[in-house]
């Protein structure tokens, strides 16, 4: 039988007690990996590995389509999306599908179409995955040399990297096209409480776009997560798409330099570790974006951010007490600081009380009430609009933390019954996934480096309990 692995490399792998167990023709003797090692059995079988990846893509797209239709079926137009536990429809709404002024859902048919298209796509991918896993050639090198590869072929690997970068760049341009030409996207900052609009004045200045990367991640700076302008977001995607496409072309046309050949480990497991590391970074950045940013993730769909809910409570009580005759400009709270308004460390007028820690919040319902030196007292007294009051009252009771509401410092009740903000779900899931992808990155990077150095030992199995158990057969 043709041995596809180095005996020296895999001498440590524990074998099954029943050596005859074979799954899809990939037994341990042939590959050096047991059945539960999954795709590791296919490291040197490019055709079968293609099948596994296409089938995996089919599963991902199937989930997207099925969950999309599930959310459409359960959607209640009279309630905000964030009160219904939705995580996919808010993304479609943010892209401008089916919504109008103030984030009101006008038509759910685009959401239905999206779900059906994903289901159809998943079927095509599923058939392709099954074909390549069961019927297609085991290796692509002989039949389709363009698609074939050897993990150690550095030039081929950077060509594949280039193709992936071009596809990512084209994905970024799809958002740009949607925003510029195909109906626009939802802008939470549009006058009067948000609306769908086409982006007409892209920000392409490298100083502005790359200035975000140079910002501090702390406080009012907020690194790239601080972006609060759709022109900057879409312009950033123009830059990102261009860099990815040009970088992809460059990687296809060039061979890796000598320093890159020396610096990197060139093996299947090493590439897996690099990919997991990149996905981990994506996960952590997405976590911060969905938790703090209310422009890319409008509060009309995802619910308020933590600081936004806190500031909304201060504004709601200021409006209420002002109508009852309180002088909100001079009233003192129990600490001697301003009860409703006070000054920040840098002199701006901000909301008083517990919410002062969130004084650098920017939100579309609040910014019209600011002047050159922070909150403007005369605007607070005269210019408040009903939509601002309604929105702040709604956000006050839908904090993403499900935090305790308080009146006069006494905790009274949780903000809403059975309410978990989509921001909480999305931020937590992306943080946890980002963390585990990082652990996977470290694990596979360590294994790849050890294998490259020639001293891979794996786990010492002499003391493993399973060795002394009765064989399964």
UniProtKB/Swiss-Prot annotation:
<dbReference type="GO" id="GO:0009772">
    <property type="term" value="P:photosynthetic electron transport in photosystem II"/>
</dbReference>
<keyword id="KW-0604">Photosystem II</keyword>
<keyword id="KW-0472">Membrane</keyword>
<dbReference type="InterPro" id="IPR000932">
    <property type="entry name" value="PS_antenna-like"/>
</dbReference>
<keyword id="KW-0812">Transmembrane</keyword>
<keyword id="KW-0148">Chlorophyll</keyword>
<dbReference type="GO" id="GO:0046872">
    <property type="term" value="F:metal ion binding"/>
</dbReference>
<dbReference type="GO" id="GO:0009523">
    <property type="term" value="C:photosystem II"/>
</dbReference>
<keyword id="KW-1133">Transmembrane helix</keyword>
<dbReference type="InterPro" id="IPR005869">
    <property type="entry name" value="PSII_PsbC"/>
</dbReference>
<feature type="transmembrane region" description="Helical">
    <location>
        <begin position="134"/>
        <end position="155"/>
    </location>
</feature>
<comment type="similarity">
    <text>Belongs to the PsbB/PsbC family. PsbC subfamily.</text>
</comment>
<keyword id="KW-0934">Plastid</keyword>
<feature type="transmembrane region" description="Helical">
    <location>
        <begin position="291"/>
        <end position="312"/>
    </location>
</feature>
<keyword id="KW-0157">Chromophore</keyword>
<keyword id="KW-0007">Acetylation</keyword>
<keyword id="KW-0602">Photosynthesis</keyword>
<feature type="propeptide">
    <location>
        <begin position="1"/>
        <end position="14"/>
    </location>
</feature>
<dbReference type="Pfam" id="PF00421">
    <property type="entry name" value="PSII"/>
</dbReference>
<keyword id="KW-0150">Chloroplast</keyword>
<dbReference type="GO" id="GO:0009535">
    <property type="term" value="C:chloroplast thylakoid membrane"/>
</dbReference>
<feature type="transmembrane region" description="Helical">
    <location>
        <begin position="255"/>
        <end position="275"/>
    </location>
</feature>
<dbReference type="GO" id="GO:0045156">
    <property type="term" value="F:electron transporter, transferring electrons within the cyclic electron transport pathway of photosynthesis activity"/>
</dbReference>
<feature type="transmembrane region" description="Helical">
    <location>
        <begin position="447"/>
        <end position="471"/>
    </location>
</feature>
<keyword id="KW-0464">Manganese</keyword>
<dbReference type="InterPro" id="IPR036001">
    <property type="entry name" value="PS_II_antenna-like_sf"/>
</dbReference>
<comment type="subunit">
    <text>PSII is composed of 1 copy each of membrane proteins PsbA, PsbB, PsbC, PsbD, PsbE, PsbF, PsbH, PsbI, PsbJ, PsbK, PsbL, PsbM, PsbT, PsbX, PsbY, PsbZ, Psb30/Ycf12, at least 3 peripheral proteins of the oxygen-evolving complex and a large number of cofactors. It forms dimeric complexes.</text>
</comment>
<dbReference type="GO" id="GO:0016168">
    <property type="term" value="F:chlorophyll binding"/>
</dbReference>
<keyword id="KW-0597">Phosphoprotein</keyword>
<feature type="binding site">
    <location>
        <position position="367"/>
    </location>
    <ligand>
        <name>[CaMn4O5] cluster</name>
    </ligand>
</feature>
<comment type="function">
    <text>One of the components of the core complex of photosystem II (PSII). It binds chlorophyll and helps catalyze the primary light-induced photochemical processes of PSII. PSII is a light-driven water:plastoquinone oxidoreductase, using light energy to abstract electrons from H(2)O, generating O(2) and a proton gradient subsequently used for ATP formation.</text>
</comment>
<feature type="modified residue" description="N-acetylthreonine">
    <location>
        <position position="15"/>
    </location>
</feature>
<dbReference type="InterPro" id="IPR044900">
    <property type="entry name" value="PSII_PsbC_sf"/>
</dbReference>
<keyword id="KW-0479">Metal-binding</keyword>
<protein>
    <recommendedName>
        <fullName>Photosystem II CP43 reaction center protein</fullName>
    </recommendedName>
</protein>
<feature type="modified residue" description="Phosphothreonine">
    <location>
        <position position="15"/>
    </location>
</feature>
<keyword id="KW-0793">Thylakoid</keyword>
<feature type="transmembrane region" description="Helical">
    <location>
        <begin position="178"/>
        <end position="200"/>
    </location>
</feature>
<feature type="transmembrane region" description="Helical">
    <location>
        <begin position="69"/>
        <end position="93"/>
    </location>
</feature>
């Amino acid at each position: 039988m043709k041995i596809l692995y180095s005996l020296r490399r895999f001498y440590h792998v524990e074998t099954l007690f029943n050596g005859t167990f074979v799954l899809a023709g990939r037994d341990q003797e042939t590959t050096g990996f047991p059945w539960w090692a999954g795709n590791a059995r296919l490291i040197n079988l490019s055709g079968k590995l293609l099948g596994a990846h296409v089938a995996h893509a089919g599963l991902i797209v199937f989930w997207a389509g099925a969950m999309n239709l599930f959310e459409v079926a359960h959607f209640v137009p009279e309630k905000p999306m964030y009160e219904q536990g939705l995580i996919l429809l808010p993304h479609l709404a943010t892209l401008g599908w089916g919504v109008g002024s103030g984030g009101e859902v006008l038509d759910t048919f685009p959401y239905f179409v999206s779900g059906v298209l994903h289901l159809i796509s998943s079927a095509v991918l599923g058939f392709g995955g099954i074909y390549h896993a069961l019927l297609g050639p085991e290796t692509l090198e002989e039949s389709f040399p363009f698609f074939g590869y050897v993990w150690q072929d550095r030039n081929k690997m950077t060509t594949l990297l280039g193709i992936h970068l071009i596809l990512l760049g084209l994905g970024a341009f799809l958002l740009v096209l949607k925003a510029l030409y195909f109906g626009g996207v939802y802008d939470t900052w549009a006058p009067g409480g948000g609306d769908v609009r086409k982006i007409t004045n892209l920000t392409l200045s490298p100083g502005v776009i790359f200035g975000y990367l140079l910002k501090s991640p702390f406080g009012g700076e907020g690194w790239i997560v601080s972006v609060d302008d759709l022109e900057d977001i879409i312009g950033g995607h123009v830059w990102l798409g261009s860099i990815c496409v040009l970088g992809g072309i460059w990687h296809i046309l060039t061979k890796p330099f000598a320093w890159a050949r020396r610096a990197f480990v060139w093996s299947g497991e090493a590439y897996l570790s690099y990919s997991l590391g990149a996905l981990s970074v994506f996960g952590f950045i997405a976590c911060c974006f969905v938790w703090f940013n209310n422009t890319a993730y409008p509060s009309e769909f995802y619910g308020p951010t933590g600081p936004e809910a806190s500031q909304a409570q201060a504004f709601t009580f200021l409006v209420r007490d002002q109508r009852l005759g309180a002088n909100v400009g001079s009233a003192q709270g129990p600490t001697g600081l301003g009860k409703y308004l006070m000054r920040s460390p840098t002199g701006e007028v901000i909301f008083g009380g517990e919410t002062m820690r969130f004084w650098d919040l920017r939100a579309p319902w609040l910014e019209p009430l600011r002047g050159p030196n922070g909150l403007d007292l005369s605007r607070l007294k005269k210019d408040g609009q009903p939509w601002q009051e309604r929105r702040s009252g709604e956000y006050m009771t839908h904090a993403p933390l499900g935090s305790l509401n308080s009146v006069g410092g006494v905790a009274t009740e949780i903000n809403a019954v059975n309410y978990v903000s989509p921001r909480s779900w999305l931020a937590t899931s992306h943080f946890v996934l980002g963390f585990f992808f990082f652990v996977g990155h470290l694990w596979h990077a360590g294994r790849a480096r050890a294998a490259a150095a020639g001293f891979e030992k794996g786990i010492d199995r002499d003391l493993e309990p399973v060795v002394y158990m009765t064989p399964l057969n």
